[in-house]
């Protein structure tokens, strides 16, 4: 059982992300990695799949997935950086509190997923506060970078702006297709 749990938490093989929609069975496999399933579910929910998109627009959900993944990783890294860098807009205790809340929710989510190994357990709805904390940390990190005169900081802010804009546009297009399909 422990090896199975470890495998579920650490396996990030390509077969799981070859299809960016949640896989419930009958497709290539069933979701088992809570991190990947959470990301897929946060974007597409349990019911959106390739049938909602015209063949010539399949790049849209895939680009949205990968941009969301990059933004999630940036948010996590930003949280760690912001926690330990002195900032004017948040005290260490406030940043530590957000980090502890994030870690507690995420830890409980993974525990829940391991104890109840079902696809529906790996739903994004169980960790929505983590997304909000990630957004706060991206904001604090962006503010920190905007105060810096260093070129890498300016490049990071520009990259975040472009990625966020692309995420918004691709989300709109995605849900335009979903709404058009459901009529």
Positions of PLM-derived features:
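Lumenal/periplasmic acceptor-binding loop at the mouth of the active site in multi-pass
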Residues: 2-79, 83, 94-102
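Helical transmembrane-bundle signal
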Residues: 72-79, 102-109, 164-175
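Membrane-interface junctions at the ends of membrane-embedded or membrane-associated helices
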Residues: 80-90, 135-160
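Membrane-interface catalytic loops of GT-C/OST-like multi-pass glycosylation enzymes that act
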Residues: 109-128, 179-182
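Hydrophobic/aromatic-rich transmembrane helices and adjacent perimembrane loops
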Residues: 121-142
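Signature aromatic-anchored transmembrane alpha helix within multi-pass, membrane-resident enzymes
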Residues: 145-182
């Amino acid at each position: 059982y422990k090896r199975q749990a470890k495998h579920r938490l650490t396996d990030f093989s390509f077969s799981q992300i070859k299809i960016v929609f949640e896989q419930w069975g009958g497709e290539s496999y069933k979701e088992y990695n809570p991190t990947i399933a959470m990301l897929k579910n946060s974007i597409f929910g349990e019911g959106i799949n390739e049938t909602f998109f015209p063949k010539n627009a399949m790049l849209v959900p895939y680009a949205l997935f990968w941009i969301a993944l990059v933004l999630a990783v940036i948010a996590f890294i930003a949280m760690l950086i912001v926690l330990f860098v002195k900032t004017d807009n948040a005290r260490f205790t406030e940043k530590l509190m957000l980090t502890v809340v994030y870690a507690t929710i995420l830890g409980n989510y993974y525990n829940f997923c391991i104890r109840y190994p079902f696809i529906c357990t790996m739903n994004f709805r169980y960790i929505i506060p983590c997304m909000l904390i990630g957004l706060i940390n991206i904001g604090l990190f962006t503010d920190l970078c905007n105060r810096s005169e260093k070129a890498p900081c300016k490049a990071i802010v520009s990259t975040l702006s472009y990625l966020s804009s692309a995420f918004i546009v691709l989300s709109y297009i995605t849900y335009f297709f979903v709404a058009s399909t459901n009529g």
